[in-house]
Structure formats: C-alpha cells, structure tokens
C-alpha cells in the first residue's frame, strides 16, 4: 500500500478490503456522474455571482431565474436546485465534499479534466500518460471490466453515457462491455413506436456537439435497459452541466443540474419498482472534476484553474449509514471510487489491482462506529 493512501485507511479505522458478501444487502451498484458539476452548486445552490448576464451569460430574465432557483440561504437554494439529492439522498445516505464544513474530496490525477478524471475514478489510480481527452483507448482496465469478468456478474454490467469518448475510456474493443455513448442510435432490430421516435431524434436532431448527446435522450434507453436486462453494475454519465458551463450559460447549468437531479430520481424510482433492485441497490453519485470560481473562471477547469481538483461524492443504499451531509471527516479522493463500487458487491478490487486506492470504508457499513 502506498503512503499516499495509507493514512486514509487508518483514519477511517476499517480494513481496506471488500466487505464480506454475506454481510451486505447490496446486490446492484449504479455509479452516476454529472460532468463538471461544481461542489459549490451541490452544497450552496445557485451562485449569486453568476445569476446575471455579465458574469453568468444568462439569457433568461434575471427575475425569472431568481424565482426558480434563488432562496435566502444556501440550504434552501441547494434544495430547490437538487431536491432529490437534498431530501431522499441526504436522508438515506451520505454526501461528502462540503469544504466549508471540513469535508474534502478531490482528484489526484494532476489534470482536473474529464478523461484523466474518469480513468482515476474507474480504475482506482491516476495515469499521467492520459493527458488529453483525445488519448484514445484506455490501456487500464476499469473496475467495470474487472467485475464483468467475474462469473456471477458476467453479462450484467452496462454503460450509458452522453459522451462518445466513453467508448475509449472503457476500451470496448478489449473489455467487450456494452457501452451506449454519444449519438449512436440506441436501438436495433424491430422498434416499438416510442423507440422509433427516439431513433429518429437521434438521427435527425441538429447536434450542438458531435460528441455529446443530450442528457434527456440518454434517459429513455437507460430506463429500458433497467426493465429488460436486469443490469447489476451500471455506469451512467450525464454531460450537460459541463457543456453549458463551457458555453458560458449559467442559467442552463442550473437547468441541467436540476434535470440531472430529476433523472437520478427517475432512475432510483424505476429501480425500486423492480423486485430485483428494490432495497438491494446502492447509488454512488459524483463528478469527474471541479471548475474555477471567479466571474470568468467558472466556465473552465484544468490544473491551471484553482479549485478544479475539488469534487463531491454522494452514496445511498442499504449498506450506507444515513448520516446526511458529512462534516469534519478525513479527506477522500476520486481514486477510491473504483474499489468502493467493488466493495459494495463484496469484492476486493485491490487484491486484483494493488495500485488502486482503498474503498471509502465509512460509507460501506451501517454497523461501523464513529463519525
């Protein structure tokens, strides 16, 4: 174990191993990402500095935007922006990363943009070779590929994402994972009436970005997969929060964050309605990187933009204590997410990948003591 992560394990006072499968209620894990959604919006809601045309580039009238997303306190603002996160998830799980309360979460890849972040998140360790979003096929197997190689999970692992680069991040040629990403039409063969409409939208909609399909377009085939294929390990990547920030449209950042929260709620409700998922599913919700925080800096991210390394992580499921917003706890890092996904399924990812960071053990056991 490297010294870089060893102190985290000691502070959490639990072994950095997969939990015994017999002691866990979780049988399904969903890792959900909203690309580039800042911790500031997660914990404080709409940013007053950006609720205007000058800094936030808003096209909506300021009065209308304030009516929808502005409230007197950070707690009220975050709840109106992200109601599912701050009602259901906060009541049933844990939310980490509020720096104002001594809860720190950050990346360790040294770049603070998407491909290096997803590699760190999904493989459990950073890779300095991955220094571009155009890097190409990932040389590092992800925890999803590893889990798909286990007999009990083979063929029960899927990826749905708006960004076409996920086909490289998950290296589909090597992993053979089903990765639905970008503008590839989601259906094949005989289509239902609803599927035919969505297929036409995929093929005929004007693309603001050739690499990113709209979040809403992803949601329908995602929900179909839940009903039809009984996926047990699922990755879901939404992208509009990052895209609209790069476009300098803070009003649409807020709208897309609000819709992201709705999509997560919709996915949770759909899974809880299925007997195979009900009360046996854990959600891990996070982001790949932060952003800057000034009147111009919020649009961008990268190691040169201070604050881009800061992220947030939320966890909800049958094996996570309902502690809500965490405060004054040890720092967690993005690399710990991979082993955490595996640990909820009773698997020790670090035994197979010693370079991986340990799981976030404090979210793994209702019986563990301390806060």
Task: Please report, for each region that a protein language model flagged, where it lies by residue.
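Structural recognition of the beta-strand scaffold that forms the well-ordered cores
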Residues: 29-33, 40-41, 96-99, 120-122, ...
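Substrate-binding rim/cap in mid-to-C-terminal beta-strand-loop elements of soluble/periplasmic
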Residues: 118-124, 300-347
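Acidic, His- and aromatic-enriched active-site or binding-groove loops in soluble protein domains
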Residues: 123-136, 176-214, 218
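Active-site His/acidic residue clusters
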Residues: 172-174, 220-266
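Short, structured active-site-proximal loop/turn typified by the sulfatase FGly-forming signature C/S-X-P-X-R
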Residues: 40-111
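Metal-dependent active-site segment of extracytoplasmic phospho-/sulfohydrolases and closely related
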Residues: 30-31, 39, 259-299, 341
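Hydrophobic h-region of N-terminal signal peptides that target proteins for export
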Residues: 10-20
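Non-catalytic, well-ordered alpha-helical segments in soluble enzyme domains
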Residues: 144, 151, 328-365
């Amino acid at each position: 174990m490297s010294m870089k992560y060893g102190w985290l394990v000691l502070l959490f006072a639990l072994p950095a191993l997969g939990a015994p499968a017999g002691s866990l209620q979780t049988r399904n894990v969903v890792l959900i990402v909203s690309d580039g959604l800042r911790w500031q919006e997660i914990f404080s809601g709409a940013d007053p500095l950006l609720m205007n045309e000058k800094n936030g580039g808003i096209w909506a009238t300021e009065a209308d935007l304030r009516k929808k997303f502005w409230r007197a306190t950070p707690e009220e603002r975050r709840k109106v922006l992200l109601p599912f996160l701050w009602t259901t998830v906060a009541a049933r799980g844990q939310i980490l990363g509020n720096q104002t309360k001594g809860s720190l979460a950050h990346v360790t890849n040294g770049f603070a943009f998407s491909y290096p972040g997803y590699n760190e998140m999904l493989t459990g360790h950073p890779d300095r070779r991955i220094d571009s979003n155009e890097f190409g096929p990932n040389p590092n197997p992800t925890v999803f590929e590893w889990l798909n190689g286990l007999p009990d999970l083979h063929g029960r692992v899927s990826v749905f994402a708006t960004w076409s680069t996920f086909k490289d991040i998950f290296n589909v040629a090597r992993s053979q994972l089903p990765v639905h990403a970008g503008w590839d039409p989601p259906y094949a063969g005989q289509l239902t009436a609803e599927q035919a409409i969505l297929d036409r939208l995929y093929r005929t909609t004007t693309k603001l970005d050739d690499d990113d399909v709209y979040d809403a377009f992803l949601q329908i085939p995602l929900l179909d997969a839940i009903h039809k294929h009984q996926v047990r390990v699922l990755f879901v990547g939404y992208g509009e929060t990052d895209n609209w920030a790069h476009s300098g449209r803070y009003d649409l950042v807020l709208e897309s964050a609000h819709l992201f929260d709705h999509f997560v709620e919709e996915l949770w409700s759909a899974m809880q309605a299925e007997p195979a998922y009900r009360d046996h599913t854990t959600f891990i919700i996070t982001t790949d990187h932060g952003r800057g925080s000034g009147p111009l800096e919020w649009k961008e991210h990268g190691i040169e933009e201070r604050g881009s390394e800061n992220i947030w992580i939320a966890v909800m499921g049958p094996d996570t204590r309902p502690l809500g917003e965490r405060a004054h706890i040890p720092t967690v890092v993005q690399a710990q997410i991979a082993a955490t996904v595996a640990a909820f399924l009773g698997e020790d990812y670090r035994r197979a990948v010693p370079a991986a960071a340990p799981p976030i053990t404090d979210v793994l056991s209702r019986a563990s003591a301390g806060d």
